[in-house]
Each structure stands twice: as C-alpha cells, then as structure tokens.
Amino acid sequence: MLAIGSSIPNWIVARDSSIAPKYPPVGLQVYTLGFLLNAPGADTRSILKQIADIGIKEIETATGGNGLYYGQKPKVFAEMAKDTGLKWIGNHIGGLPRTPAASATSTAARPRSRNLRDNIQEIVDDAAEGGCSWVICSSSAISTLDEIKRTAEVFVKAGDLAEQNNMRFAYHNHQSEFDQIEGVTAFDYVLTNTDKKKVFMELDLAWATAAGQDPVALFKKYPGRFPLWHVKDLDKTTGRPCPVGTGKVDFKHIFTNSKLSGVEHTFIEQDGAKNIDDPASSVQWLKNNIYK
C-alpha cells in the first residue's frame, strides 16, 4: 500500500533489481455482471469464481438488486473473493442525493439509499470490515453550482475519514462532470477545491472520451490524481458500452501515458454486458494488445 497522497504507483518501481509489471493487474467492476450477481438466489461464490477464471485479479463492487455486497456482510463477501483468488479493492456508493422531482405521488416517505452525505461513517466502517483500501463515490448531484459545491464539501469529509481509517477516497465520473455550469465544470471544481492527497478521481476512460476529453490531457493537468481507472469502451456507431478494444477509446495512447496519472488499479466495466464472455473478451484484448 502506498502512503496517503503518493502519486507513484508501486507497480512502477522495481524491487530487488527485478522487473516490475508494466501495468496494474486487470480488474473488473462487477456491476458489469450485475445481471448474474443480482439475480434471485444468485450463487455469489460461484460467480466470483467465474470472474477469477477469465483472468481477473481485482474487483470493485456496486449496489445492486440484492443490496450492498450482493446480500453478504462485507467480511463474508471479502472472504468469498479471497477464496477465489480475487482482491476486493473498493465499493461504489452514491454521494450527494439528488432532489426527487415533484410528482403526484410523493417520494418523501420512501427510504433513501445509503449515501456519503448521510452515512459516511457506516460506509467507511463497511469498507474497513471488508479489507478494502478505497471508498469510491459512484455519482453525485451536480446539476447546479450549489450541488457541485456541496458535493465537494462531502468529498472533503469523505477524504478525511477515509485517511483516518488507512483508506483513500475517489470520485467516479460520467459525462456530466465536464458540462459547463455557471462557468465551471464539476470535474475541475472538485479537483481544484479538495486536497490532492485526500480526494482522487476514478477516471472512466469512456465517459471522459464521450465528453470530448483526452484522458492524457487530464493526466497532464492533474498529475497523480487518477489512481483508479474504469477501462470502458464505446461502440463507434451507437456510443454504447462495448467490449474493450472494439470501440473508439484509444487505449494504447492512454496506457502509454499512464505513469503520469498515478494509476494503481484498473477495472474493466461494460454497462449492459450480456454475459461473462463480454468481459472475458476485454481481458483477452488487453493481454494481447496492452499487457503483451
């Protein structure tokens, strides 16, 4: 584990004169296989074994139909992952809740999902119980400048609490973080109004590309702030997520310049994957074209 705030990943540095791996292990955001893990009666352990069998080494989790950690307690889920040869790096959780739209049927009485603003201590405690090294915000309300500012305030608290528990905090982007709102973007506001040693980004390479951003230019603008990546591709025609290497994201350009980003963990993600063959083909493409 790197010291808090370090921008040089441990996989870059050779130890005992040996040659260090060129890139981090291939990981998976298991949201990709939510249709399996969230199915009624899903055999979590068996599905994790299938994930390991396609060459995945590290995983992230996300809330789904079976609840947090796919119906398991954090420690139990962590043991399942470890037993199948997987390392559980972090879990996605929402940030600042969006204000529900007014409607004839009030949503005020409905229980609100756990989120960083309201449940940060519980979320960090769960991550610690599972042995995770990262607390990750999956998305947050950022449609107004006020929401952007309040989101940044929540992230400051999350970064502080994660550090106190020997973990780190990161924010996962979509396209909307790059929209101009009153002359600023949520992406720039968060990165320039939080401590670079406590608040990091999990850069979704596909959504950044879809927003017209060059990930390498972002690395240069904010060096060391991107220790986590979502390795996602987008179909050249439809713009929808597709297996890595079959779409329009320039992964060779991005990986070649990865050192500047401070990347430590990379997670394949494919929204709408139809079966485990989709991430399996992404793993194979990366091994053949990037990790060779």
What does each model-found stretch correspond to?
Residues 3-7, 18, 98-200, 276:
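Active-site acidic/histidine proton-transfer and metal-coordination neighborhood
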Residues 69-70, 74-76, 81, 134, ...:
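Non-transmembrane, interaction-prone segments in cytosolic or luminal domains
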Residues 4-11, 15-27, 35-52, 131, ...:
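Histidine-acidic metal/acid-base catalytic patches
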Residues 24-30, 59-61, 88-93, 135-137, ...:
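Hydrophobic faces of well-ordered beta-strands that scaffold small-molecule active sites
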Residues 31, 56, 92, 169-174, ...:
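Aromatic side chains
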Residues 2-129, 133, 163, 284, ...:
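N-terminal pre-domain/capping segments
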Residues 34-41, 62-73, 95-101, 111-117, ...:
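Acidic-and-aromatic substrate-binding clefts and catalytic sites of carbohydrate-active enzymes
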